[in-house]
């Protein structure tokens, strides 16, 4: 207890980035507390001043800042059981399979985190509303590297857990 969920995720991401090398972490948030804690952790922070536009607005802010990168990994801050090892393994899977995208997979269902190579940035920029990149993954299944997840708990998204009332 004690450490906010978003900080746990950020620390796992920082650990993964230091293991992988050549990574920049960009936090996109509407929340002042998250912005200041992330800045204290030494990562780049961008404010989403239009969160009402949905997930796509945060994604686009991050993409615009990372447009020179070869690829972007998108992660949500409310998957407390996701491990550093899974993040690192996903990047390795993406690199070794030479596909344009990579994502986690559990029981044939894709999940976060996801990685998109630069060739998909334009398609990602065109998404609107409360949608992420899943539609692009579904549009190009032949160009996706899937990392099979052993422990279902890793992909539990706390928002969904509490919004649905499911376990």
Kindly give the residue locations of the regions a language model identified:
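Short glycine- and hydrophobic/aromatic-rich loop-to-beta-strand nucleating segment
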Residues: 112-116, 156-158
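Hydrophobic alpha-helical segments typical of transmembrane helices
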Residues: 9, 86, 120, 132-133
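Short beta-strand and adjoining strand-loop segment in the mid-core
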Residues: 60-62, 119-124
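Nucleotide and nucleotide-moiety/phosphate-recognizing core
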Residues: 1-110, 140-151
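Conserved alpha/beta core of the MobA/IspD/sugar-nucleotide pyrophosphorylase nucleotidyltransferase superfamily
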Residues: 122, 126-167
């Amino acid at each position: 207890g004690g450490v906010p969920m978003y900080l746990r995720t950020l620390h796992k991401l920082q650990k993964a980035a230091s293991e992988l090398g050549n990574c920049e972490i960009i936090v996109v948030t509407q929340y002042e507390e998250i912005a200041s804690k992330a800045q204290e952790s030494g990562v780049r922070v961008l404010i989403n001043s239009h969160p009402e536009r949905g997930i796509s607005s945060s994604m686009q802010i991050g993409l615009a800042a990372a447009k020179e990168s070869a690829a972007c990994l998108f992660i949500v801050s409310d998957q407390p059981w996701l491990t550093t090892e899974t993040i690192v393994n996903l990047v390795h899977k993406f690199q070794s399979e030479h596909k344009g995208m990579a994502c986690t997979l559990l029981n044939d269902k894709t999940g976060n985190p996801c990685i998109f190579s630069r060739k998909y940035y334009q398609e990602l920029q065109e998404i609107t509303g409360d949608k992420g990149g899943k539609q692009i993954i579904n549009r190009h299944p032949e160009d996706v590297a899937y990392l099979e997840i052993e422990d279902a708990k890793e992909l539990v998204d706390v928002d969904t857990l509490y919004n649905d009332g499911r376990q």
